[in-house]
Amino acid sequence: MQVSRTGIANVVCSFCLFSILFIESTVSAQGLIAPNRQLDPEAGMSAILLGTGIPLPQADRASACNALIAGDRVFLVDTGRNCVLRVREAGLTDLNGIFYTHYHSDHFIGLGEILLNYGVAGLDKSIPVEGPVGAKEMVDGMLANYSLDVSYRIAHHGDKFSTAIMNPTVTESRPGVIFDEDGLTITMFPVCHEPIAPAVGYRFEYKDQTVVFSGDTNVCPAFAEGARDADLLVSEVSNQAIWDRALSMARAANNQRQVEMIQEGLEYHAESLALARMAQEVGVKKLALTHFFPSFPPTEQAEANFIRGMSDFYDGPIVVGRDGMEVAP
């Protein structure tokens, strides 16, 4: 029996198409690819906790990354490891800007992946990137790392690959109002993460709502002032009681290095009970926790253990963040 080349090509093509459709349908059915999010320009604000983890890798927690949605505008606050996966799962197909709180790598390491994937998807614009002093050095380093990759994609795809996306518009700012446009005001404020400086948080105000992102900080007057009267405070948090047990084990093992590393980490993170007291004192209406130190599995039992005692000092709702969780003020 003779089969024409055209016939073979048609069979192969049909098989390939079937395979692609099968893969896409399987992935979608498993919830790995979300439909593109439809944004309502008349809506208020919400925060998506895209990455709730810390530098140590954890399968179910990306490192620091949040999205702020204000009407039909989308901003990211930090872009940690695997943030690009959570952005895709959230169906965020466009970005209006990226803000950085500081330059620990677990807060920015995902920037290149995010820009590259938007470029491959065809988003053809330069995305504004803003942060405290150091933003330009960080972005320049990322662009240097991606220079070969970008040159290959341009050689291969030409103008089908967006070069604008890989050239973000970078602004270094000092605390104060850094954005005021179409009813949305964004204020950068200092926080306390020494010896890391500068380190900042962000306050978003839109349609009579206020959403605040702490960045990395201990509980201090500057953080308290930045969070004052927030409808929603998205804050990092540490748990002293859990770390006290870890310190006891490290001392029992005569592991002085581990003891000092834990103590140094506790110095510049927001202890849970102190955070609860602060939130109550400054009138925070809802508290959403992220960037857990130490991290833990996203189970109800582990979550209850981590926030034990916080409601003794704070009478508002406490949301224990999981990756992909959306929180409204």
Tell where the protein language model's regions lie, with residue ranges.
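Acidic/polar short surface loop at catalytic or gating sites that assists cofactor/ion binding
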Residues: 132-170, 251-255
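Signal peptide processing junction and immediate N-terminal pro/mature segment
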Residues: 24-31
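Cap/insert and terminal regions of metallo-dependent hydrolase folds
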Residues: 201, 210, 218-322
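Bacterial N-terminal signal peptides
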Residues: 12-24
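Non-globular, low-confidence helical/coil segments that flank catalytic cores
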Residues: 47, 127, 138-144, 320, ...
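Bacterial N-terminal signal peptides that target proteins for export
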Residues: 1-15
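Core dinuclear metal-dependent hydrolase active-site scaffold
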Residues: 31-92, 166-228, 323-329
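Active-site metal-binding motif and surrounding structural segment of the metallo-beta-lactamase
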Residues: 73-74, 81-130, 229, 233
